[in-house]
């Protein structure tokens, strides 16, 4: 059965050639990204435990995580957290399997703690955080689950929803993405341990000049005073300027912690490396899209991908799929930009979308008619192999934020 794939040429100014471009990335320690990361870690842990016990991923969605900011008194040399960060795990997961209880809350809380321990170095998970699992219950008859899986080897969409992807990234998009990845890389943390994980990067390109505004939480126990703090800021700026020279030939201005007022004793220092310690809250889906960026110059889906089940939830699968299709088209065909939008219809096989729309701005001197069939074939092949995205998610080979 042929798939509903439409390839068309569109006429618009590519983002790289527009006068103004805005790009944002919330780093892994930002409260919104903490919520995303925990939601995804919980979903992955539940999926693996379901497979281990029952041989199949049972229904769940853990895309409702709230991070409620705590209270801290940071000070140079080391402060303290006086009110812990509260993290609420919510959503739904099968807890009763053939009259046997499955330890949803135990698995979820352990996954959340492991994620925090592995992600935010200066966070004492046992003392700085309270994790509360209120994941709703569900029950299932395994025989009916297996029978349904046999009847429908391709999962049926559990929602009418769309996913969006685009490629290639502009220089500004790459720079914003790579800046946060640099500052939160293991190598950089070893060289400059004072830089916390809560790193937010905002990029503005105006013509051929790029402004990068970086908010980087500095860990108070790693700096002895204002002088050392300012030295850390200088090192951040220098590292990002060096990175920028490898990414673009445009002029790049780097600003770090612009709310600081040294004369008034105002510095962005934290005890834990995340602003969640001091009243900054976070929610799933309020931050980066599945490509790791927030891009108001582009089409975007508002779906919260993190924590959604990797089997049939198109809010997760179609956003990743659209990104993969766009990337392959951009890498193999003469396109300036490609936009992919995929729409499901609830109850229908996820490899048979209601529409897969591929909009292309071809490179100068080319027409989409030259490679329309190739673009169609790329999308068709990804849809035919859509279930491999589930495996990529479970193996942690793709990030959704």
Curated annotation (Swiss-Prot):
Residues that, per the record, bind ATP: 136-141
Enzyme class of the recorded protein, top EC level: transferase
Alphabetical list of Pfam families matching this protein: AdoMet_Synthase
Cited Gene3D superfamilies: 3.30.300.10, S-adenosylmethionine synthetase, C-terminal domain (3.30.300.280)
Catalysed reactions, semicolon-separated: L-methionine + ATP + H2O = S-adenosyl-L-methionine + phosphate + diphosphate
Co-factor(s): Mg(2+)
InterPro entries linked to this entry: AdoMet_synthase_2_family (IPR027790), AdoMet_synthase_3 (IPR042544), S-AdoMet_synthetase_arc (IPR002795)
Pathway(s) the chain acts in: Amino-acid biosynthesis; S-adenosyl-L-methionine biosynthesis; S-adenosyl-L-methionine from L-methionine: step 1/1
Keyword Hydrolase part of the UniProt annotation: no
UniProt EC number: 2.5.1.6
Keywords: ATP-binding, Magnesium, Nucleotide-binding, One-carbon metabolism, Transferase
Biological process annotations from GO: one-carbon metabolic process; S-adenosylmethionine biosynthetic process
GO molecular function, one term: ATP binding
Keyword Cell cycle: no
Family: Belongs to the AdoMet synthase 2 family.
Its biological purpose: Catalyzes the formation of S-adenosylmethionine from methionine and ATP.
Protein name: S-adenosylmethionine synthase
Organism (species): Pyrococcus horikoshii (strain ATCC 700860 / DSM 12428 / JCM 9974 / NBRC 100139 / OT-3)
Encoding gene per record: mat
């Amino acid at each position: 059965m042929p798939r509903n794939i439409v390839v068309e040429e569109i006429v618009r100014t590519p983002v790289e050639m527009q006068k103004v471009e805005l790009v944002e990335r919330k780093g892994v320690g930002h409260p919104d990204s903490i919520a995303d990361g925990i939601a995804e870690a919980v979903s992955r842990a539940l999926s693996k435990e379901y497979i281990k016990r029952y041989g199949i991923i049972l229904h769940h969605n853990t895309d409702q995580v709230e991070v409620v900011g705590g209270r801290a008194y940071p000070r140079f040399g080391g402060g303290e957290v006086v009110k812990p960060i509260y993290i609420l795990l919510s959503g739904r997961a099968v807890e009763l399997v053939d009259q046997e209880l499955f330890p949803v809350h135990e698995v979820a809380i352990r996954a959340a703690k492991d994620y925090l321990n592995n992600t935010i170095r200066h966070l004492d998970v046992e003392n700085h955080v309270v994790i509360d699992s209120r994941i709703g219950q569900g029950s299932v008859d395994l025989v009916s689950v297996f029978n349904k899986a046999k009847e429908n080897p391709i999962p049926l969409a559990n929602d009418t929803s769309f996913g969006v992807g685009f490629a290639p990234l502009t220089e500004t998009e790459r720079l914003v993405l790579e800046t946060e990845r640099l500052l939160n890389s293991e190598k950089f943390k070893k060289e400059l341990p004072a830089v916390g994980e809560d790193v937010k990067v905002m990029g503005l390109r105006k013509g051929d000049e790029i402004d990068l505004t970086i908010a980087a939480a500095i860990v108070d126990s790693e700096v002895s005073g204002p002088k050392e703090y300012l030295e850390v800021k200088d090192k951040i700026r220098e590292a990002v300027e060096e990175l920028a020279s490898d990414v673009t030939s445009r002029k790049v201005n780097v600003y770090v912690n612009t709310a600081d007022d040294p004369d008034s004793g105002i510095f962005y220092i934290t005890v834990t490396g995340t602003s969640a310690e001091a009243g900054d809250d976070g929610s799933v889906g309020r931050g980066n899209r599945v490509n790791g960026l927030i891009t108001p110059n582009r089409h975007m889906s508002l779906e919260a991908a993190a924590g959604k089940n990797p089997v049939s939830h198109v809010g997760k699968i179609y956003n990743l799929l659209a990104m993969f299709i766009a990337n392959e088209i951009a890498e193999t065909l003469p396109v300036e930009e490609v936009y992919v939008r995929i729409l499901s219809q609830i109850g229908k096989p996820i490899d048979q979308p209601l529409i897969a729309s591929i909009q292309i701005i071809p490179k100068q001197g080319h027409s989409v008619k030259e490679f329309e069939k190739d673009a169609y074939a790329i999308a068709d092949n990804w849809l035919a192999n859509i279930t491999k995205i589930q495996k990529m998610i479970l193996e942690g080979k793709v990030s959704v934020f």
